[in-house]
């Protein structure tokens, strides 16, 4: 029976970790709506998440749209169905690729930065100092980041949708020889509000998860510089996994009927 002990220990540790994460997320959500508020900190995080992430999100989106159009042309040309390319590009970008890829880029950039910053504050006792000064660390450090993540990632995804569809348009017009007006007509004819809304809902969920994992792993880091590095890695990996899992859940809610 000794071989069952590591399995049981791992299982209960996982449950304990899930419980801590759930309590942390609940506390962070409550502190978003409970005063005092820190608008300057929220604005700072919005700029960090939104404005400074635009280049990497834009580059990812435009080349994703171009590759998607090129790959679609390669497949559809065998069946003389090239006219379906605008439809495939706009649906794929708005429903899936825009929200998921933009959020993964944000997770790699912002999730790591949050974990490193808060983790450094933890190992250097700055968080304990905030508590000593009667400042709630959850309200001061975590809530502004969660609010900024929920607010700015949907905006980034909206930009990614536009840039990604534009990338597919550019490649289709200048390389594949599509008629510009026909391509735009097919794109707008097939674009549905539900597709955009589902992508933005996903983006809000993803933004919350990215900020949550960055704050959680940074908040619970220990062991000096090595611990901060581990927390940073764990934040990016866990945020990426949760993005993919929640992507399926939200897709099921929107499109299973």
What are these model-derived regions, one by one?
Residues 232-246, 250, 254-257:
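Helical hairpin unit composed of two closely spaced alpha helices linked by a short loop
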Residues 118-143, 225-228:
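Short cytoplasmic-facing helical segments at TM-TM junctions of multi-pass membrane proteins
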């Amino acid at each position: 029976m000794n071989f069952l002990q590591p399995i049981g220990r791992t299982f209960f540790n996982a449950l304990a970790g899930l419980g801590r994460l759930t309590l942390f997320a609940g506390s962070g959500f409550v502190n978003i709506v409970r005063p005092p508020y820190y608008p300057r900190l929220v604005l700072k995080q919005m700029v960090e998440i939104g404005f400074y992430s635009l280049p990497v999100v834009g580059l990812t989106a435009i080349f994703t749209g171009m590759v998607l159009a090129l790959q679609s042309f390669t497949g559809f040309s065998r069946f003389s169905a090239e006219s379906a390319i605008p439809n495939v590009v706009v649906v794929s970008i708005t429903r899936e690729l825009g929200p998921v890829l933009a959020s993964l880029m944000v997770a790699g950039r912002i999730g790591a930065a949050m974990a490193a910053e808060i983790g450094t504050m933890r190992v250097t006792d700055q968080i304990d100092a905030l508590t000593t000064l009667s400042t709630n660390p959850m309200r001061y450090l975590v809530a502004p980041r969660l609010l900024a993540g929920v607010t700015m990632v949907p905006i980034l995804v909206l930009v990614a949708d536009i840039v990604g569809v534009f990338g597919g348009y550019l490649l289709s017009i200048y390389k594949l020889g599509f008629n510009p007006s026909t391509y735009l007509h097919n794109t707008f004819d097939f674009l549905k509000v539900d597709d955009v809304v589902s992508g933005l809902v996903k983006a809000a969920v993803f933004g919350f998860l990215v900020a949550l994992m960055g704050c959680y792993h940074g908040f619970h880091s220990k062991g000096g510089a090595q611990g901060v590095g581990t927390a940073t890695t764990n934040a990016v990996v866990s945020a990426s996994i949760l993005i993919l899992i929640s992507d399926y859940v939200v897709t099921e809610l929107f499109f299973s009927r």
